[in-house]
Amino acid sequence: ENPNKDGEILAPIFVVERMEETIKDFLTKNKGKLYLHTHPFVEAYLTKGLMSQQMKWFIKYKKWVTIIPRDSFKYLEYRLYDADKKELVSYSN
């Protein structure tokens, strides 16, 4: 059964690309800390390995993005917060 109401299935790689676009937009305008809350499986994909996606973002944007796993999130759900814990973006598939 498809969990989406509109019947569309979005590939996980597109969600990661959407995350990067959001991060890029924020980091080009602001200099503060950035926190990405996401499902533990997505967190593992973004943080594991020598050249993880998190490390690639650091090299590309010269700013560390802290990635926090949230068990209560759906698989492709994520939220982006600034240093003041203000929610910048919320996405749920």
Residues of each region from the PLM?
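C-terminal intrinsically disordered, low-complexity extensions immediately downstream
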Residues: D71, E77-N93
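Conserved glycine-centered short motifs in functionally critical loops
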Residues: E1-F58, K63-Y75
